[in-house]
Amino acid sequence: MDAQLEWASSLVPKRQLQQQQQQEQQQQQQQDFHKDQLMTVGMRIRQRVDQGYASRTPSTSDASLQPGVIRDYSSVIVPQFTRSPLPTANSLPPMLINQRTMSTEASSLEKWDVAEPAAEHEAMVNGSKRRL
């Protein structure tokens, strides 16, 4: 009898051990599956971009893809849009203000009274730069 009791008592922990091992294997398989899914996310994203988002999910219906479903709100958002005319080139530029100085016209070289020798010198310098 003692041998039978020992044998019966030894079976219970073995069964529990086997069940635990099976559960651990199932959990490990699930973890491996999830790891594989995570490792391929980047590749799947690149594939979807390459396909141009052409794949359709089961939740996408044909009615949502029909052009008649898209509503045109342009007349509500910007009613009777008209372009404003650009200013003419003949008008004076805006007034320039710098601390205490004011000017109503754009500056030009004529106002600086540039002498002819200075202009010739500038042309000579520009010509020598071109040769380099």
From Swiss-Prot:
The keyword Phosphoprotein applies. One of its GO terms (biological process) is protein localization. Residues 16-31 have a biased composition (Low complexity). InterPro entries: RNR_inhibitor (IPR013900). Residues 108-123 have a biased composition (Basic and acidic residues). It is found in: Cytoplasm; Nucleus. Its main location: cytoplasm. Signal peptide: none annotated. The keyword Secreted does not apply. This is Damage-regulated import facilitator 1. It comes from Saccharomyces cerevisiae (strain JAY291) (Baker's yeast).
